[in-house]
Design a protein with these regions (language model features):
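Primarily recognizes the serine-hydrolase "nucleophile elbow" in alpha/beta-hydrolase
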Residues: 3-53
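Mobile cap/lid helix-loop segments that gate and shape the active-site cleft of serine hydrolases
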Residues: 48-83
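Short beta-strand/loop motif that positions the catalytic acidic residue
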Residues: 87, 93-95, 99
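Conserved alpha/beta-hydrolase "acid-adjacent" motif
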Residues: 100-106
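C-terminal catalytic histidine-bearing segment of alpha/beta-hydrolase fold enzymes
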Residues: 108-157
């Protein structure tokens, strides 16, 4: 779909957003698609960390992926962090400090990796917010994201 959009409207900017568990899918997807930026919002960046921190999701992960020790290859295929490289688009990490669904250490882990490989990134850590920001914080988040995407577009012109 992104390729079709880019073919029909080559000058259009495409910004991809991955929220929560969609964060890891987005990290895996944008490597193959011509996107101008990626926003990971309250997102999982490492499936191993998700397995460790979310005891309530272990059953689902074992059914869908397998056990991390017995099915290492299946987990490695879903390791989005390893797919990141210097050609990755700019990434904005948005995460709440009180997020109980996806711990903020997922964001810190991703930030460390992006810094290590030299990918352009920015962070918006809202230390008093949970998985979904409260209305006033949500409004500020959306303003920040809009400003960030606009800056990405200006820099690409």
């Amino acid at each position: 779909l992104i390729r079709l959009l880019k073919n029909k409207y080559p000058q259009a900017f495409v910004h991809m957003i991955g929220f929560s568990r969609g964060g890891i899918q987005g990290l895996l997807s944008f490597q193959d698609d011509p996107v101008d930026s990626y926003i990971i919002w309250g997102g999982v960046s490492d499936v191993h960390l998700m397995y460790e921190e979310r005891v309530d999701l272990r059953g689902m992960l074992r059914r869908m992926v397998g056990h991390p020790k017995k099915d290492k290859e299946a987990y490695e295929q879903r390791n989005a962090i390893r797919t990141l490289n210097q050609n990755s688009p700019p990434i904005l990490i948005v995460h709440g400090g009180k997020d109980k669904q996806v711990g903020i250490h997922q964001a810190y882990y991703l930030e460390r990796r992006l810094k290590d490989i030299g990918v352009h990134y920015d962070t918006l850590y809202q230390m008093e917010e949970g998985h979904v920001p409260r209305p006033f914080a949500l409004k500020e988040t959306l303003k920040y994201i809009h400003k960030w995407m606009t800056q990405i577009e200006i820099n690409k012109k």
